Amino acid sequence: MDVVPFGGIQDQDGQIAWPPDQAFVMSVVGFDEASKSTLRFVLPDGTQFDVVSLEGLGMLKLIAWNERPHARARDAVDLCIILVNYHTVAGETLYTEHDDLLDDDFDYQIAGARIYGRMIAPLLAPNDQLRGALVSVLQEQTGDAGHSPLALAMGSECCGEYERRFQLLCALLRGIEDRL
């Protein structure tokens, strides 16, 4: 479990330095936006805690990977796992809210990744800088089908074919653009 800091504790560059000596610096870009999409859980003993939504988690995974791609490969794999499986989370909303995705070339995973993008977009909408940065990262990673470091980092253990991972990223970007 990760404990995530947020709420006005970062500097102007979106970073925090951990006490006591401020030696460990961590980016918290997107944390405030992710905190607005948390889900509250209550344990039988009454203990309450908030968990970031899948939409907020994916946004944070993309930011973390982009900031340190060689050190954050696990974030790319985690994003891939979400993209591959989000159609199961979307469930019936595919037919009730996203039926425009049902075409002759229908593919559950691609539709799920696009729905995921549509669900991330409202988190990005209020923050021009964050929205621009995330869209820019995805545009860069989907600009050349033969060269996407993110699709490569997502790894074959998540989704075997590089081309498929690239398609999922394209669907994610398209979904975000659908709602911006």
What are these regions (language model features)?
Residues 1-180:
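Compositionally biased terminal segments of proteins
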